[in-house]
């Protein structure tokens, strides 16, 4: 549950890169990552009262876990975005959040 590999049905292209799969290593994230995500959101006047139900928070967390920008996730087709953010949510819940 701490590592999720997402395989795209068709390659996803964004910013000159083509993605066939992405691996999200949620286990490598630290408390600093959580705080950094919250800080980034606050700087943009975005808030997550409950990260486990905030798609915005989950997408930023997933981006960090994969080492990509959150803009990459935001540009994905909705089914892929949903599966990836669901994996982030499941990880948060598994850690007792």
Residue ranges and their predicted role:
Residues 2-97:
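Short, surface-exposed, charged amphipathic helix/loop patches that serve as local interaction elements
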């Amino acid at each position: 549950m701490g590592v999720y590999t997402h395989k795209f049905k068709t390659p996803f292209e964004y910013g000159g890169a083509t993605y066939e799969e992405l691996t999200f290593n949620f286990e490598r994230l630290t408390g600093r990552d959580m705080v950094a995500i919250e800080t980034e959101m606050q700087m943009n006047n975005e808030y997550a009262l409950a990260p486990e139900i905030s798609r915005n928070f989950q997408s930023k967390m997933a981006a960090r876990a994969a080492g990509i920008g959150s803009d990459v996730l935001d540009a994905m087709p909705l089914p892929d975005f949903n599966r990836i953010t669901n994996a982030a949510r499941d990880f948060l819940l598994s850690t007792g959040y």
